[in-house]
Amino acid sequence: MSTTPVVNFITGNANKLREVKAILEPGITVQSKTVNLEEVQGTVEEVTLAKCRKAAEIIQGPVLVEDTCLCFKALNDLPGPYIKWFMESIGHQGLNNLLVAYEDKSADAVCTFAYSPGPGHEPILFQGRTRGKIVPPRGPADFGWDAIFEYDGQTYAEMDKTAKNNISHRGLALRKLQDWFAQQ
């Protein structure tokens, strides 16, 4: 008889926590821990691995960390892993303004999770990617850049939460994590 895996999801973002719990539970128990982790500069993979190693040391147990990118094709994948700071600095309209001079409004939403069973264990990466485009804000503006990322005619903000979780970058990455746990 197997036991339900437990992970300590390291986040201070209530919206992310809700999404992760909605996707993973009841198969994987998600506990929330807020730990102030310094974000290194680098690729999304480097950032996520560094955060996971540090969190595992602090928590002294199994941890799950996440890093999200929004990659504008016209800007050679910027803002990429720096989307959080771009959002805080220039908001939805500013992000749209970055693409005014370009015909190509396509973008990839990329979510990278790292899981570690604890300190001393090398983290395992799980990545999901959704191709969409950047549009003027539509829908509630209460979750990051969801209101400007359109997939198949709807922004993430306009979508029903279950529908979004089925196709989103975060949902895709978490399904890979679920598959990995099922193999253990």
UniProtKB/Swiss-Prot annotation:
Binding site for Mg(2+): E39
Family annotation (Gene3D superfamilies): 3.90.950.10
Keyword Hydrolase appears in the UniProt entry: yes
GO biological process assignments: deoxyribonucleoside triphosphate catabolic process; nucleotide metabolic process
Subcellular location: Cytoplasm; Nucleus
InterPro entries: ITPase, ITPase-like_fam, RdgB/HAM1
Primary location: cytoplasm
Keyword Signal listed: no
Catalyzed chemical reaction(s): ITP + H2O = IMP + diphosphate + H(+); dITP + H2O = dIMP + diphosphate + H(+); XTP + H2O = XMP + diphosphate + H(+)
Comment on bound cofactor: Binds 1 divalent metal cation per subunit; can use either Mg(2+) or Mn(2+).
Cofactor: Mg(2+); Mn(2+)
Catalytic activity, EC: 3.6.1.66
GO (cellular component) term, any one: cytoplasm
Keywords: Cytoplasm, Hydrolase, Magnesium, Manganese, Metal-binding, Nucleotide metabolism, Nucleotide-binding, Nucleus
GO molecular function annotations of the record: dITP diphosphatase activity; ITP diphosphatase activity; metal ion binding; nucleotide binding; XTP diphosphatase activity
Residues that, per the record, bind ITP: 11-16, 51, 67-68, 84, 143-146, 164, 169-170
Listed PANTHER family: INOSINE TRIPHOSPHATE PYROPHOSPHATASE, INOSINE TRIPHOSPHATE PYROPHOSPHATASE/HAM1 PROTEIN
Protein family membership: Belongs to the HAM1 NTPase family.
HAMAP family, per database record: HAM1_NTPase
Summary of subunit composition and partner proteins: Homodimer.
Function: Pyrophosphatase that hydrolyzes non-canonical purine nucleotides such as inosine triphosphate (ITP), deoxyinosine triphosphate (dITP) or xanthosine 5'-triphosphate (XTP) to their respective monophosphate derivatives. The enzyme does not distinguish between the deoxy- and ribose forms. Probably excludes non-canonical purines from RNA and DNA precursor pools, thus preventing their incorporation into RNA and DNA and avoiding chromosomal lesions.
Descriptive protein name: Inosine triphosphate pyrophosphatase
Organism, scientific name: Colletotrichum graminicola (strain M1.001 / M2 / FGSC 10212)
